[in-house]
Amino acid sequence: MNGDLNRLMARLGYQFQDLSLLELALTHRSVSRHRNYERLEFLGDAQLGQIISVALFEQFPEAAEGQLTRMRASLVRGQTLALVARELGLGEYLVLGGGELKSGGFRRDSILADALESIIGAMLLDGGEPRCREVVLAWFAPRLDAISPQSAQKDAKTRLQEWLQARKFELPTYEVTQVEGLAPKQTFDVQCSLDNVQQIFIAQGASRRKAEQEAASLALEWLEQQYD
C-alpha cells in the first residue's frame, strides 16, 4: 500500500508526513460509516474556496464582486474538481466498498470531486495552510491562467458554441440518455456529442438544462486542452 501511496504523492506534488491522513482521505463512506473521508471533505471544501477566492482577488484587481463569484463558482464546481482529480489519477487509489467498486464509483464525478476536497483537507492538517495553498494552486494553475471575468459571464453551452463556430466546427448535439428517480428528485444523464472530433461527453444534473451545461463544460475544457 505504501508503494502505491508514494506514487500517488508524487502525482499530487505533496509528501504526507502522516500517511494515515492520506489513507483516510481516500476511503469512501461505502467502506465505513464512521471512518471515511467525509469530515476531511468538509474541511477541504472550505479551504479550496478560500484558496481560489484569494487567488482570483489578487489576479483580477479590477473585477467586481459578482465577476469574482462567477469565476470562483466555475473553478470549484463538481465537474471541474472531477477533471482535476482525473488529471492526478486519483480514481485508481480510492478505497471503495464492493457495491461502489462494481458500479464504477472510481469514475463517478461526484466521488472524484469529494475525494479531491478530502485530499485538500488532509494536506491542510498534515502540512499547514501555506504548503496546502501552494500545492492546490499548482493543480489549478492552467485553469486560473485561462479564466477571465468575461468567460465566466457566459454559460458553458454558449461558450462551447462560440468556440466551435470560431473554428468552423459543427455545433454539438445534446441527448438525454437516462432519467433516474421521480419528480421532483430526478437526475438526468445527458451526452454532448462533437462530430468533428468524434468525442462524447456525459454529465449528470438535477435538470436537463443543468446536465447539458455540465456536459458542455466538459467538452469545452477538453477542446481547450487539445487545441488551444
UniProtKB/Swiss-Prot annotation:
Residues annotated for Mg(2+) binding in this entry: E41, D114, E117
Cofactor(s) named in the record: Mg(2+)
- Source organism of this protein record: Alcanivorax borkumensis (strain ATCC 700651 / DSM 11573 / NCIMB 13689 / SK2)
Function description: Digests double-stranded RNA. Involved in the processing of primary rRNA transcript to yield the immediate precursors to the large and small rRNAs (23S and 16S). Processes some mRNAs, and tRNAs when they are encoded in the rRNA operon. Processes pre-crRNA and tracrRNA of type II CRISPR loci if present in the organism.
Q: Which HAMAP family match?
A: RNase_III
Q: Which GO terms describe its molecular function?
A: double-stranded RNA binding; metal ion binding; ribonuclease III activity; rRNA binding
Q: Which CDD domains match?
A: DSRM_RNAse_III_family, RIBOc
- Gene behind this protein: rnc
Q: Which UniProt keywords apply?
A: Cytoplasm, Endonuclease, Hydrolase, Magnesium, Metal-binding, mRNA processing, Nuclease, RNA-binding, rRNA processing, rRNA-binding, tRNA processing
Question: Does the keyword section mention Magnesium?
Answer: yes
Protein name stated in the entry:
Ribonuclease 3
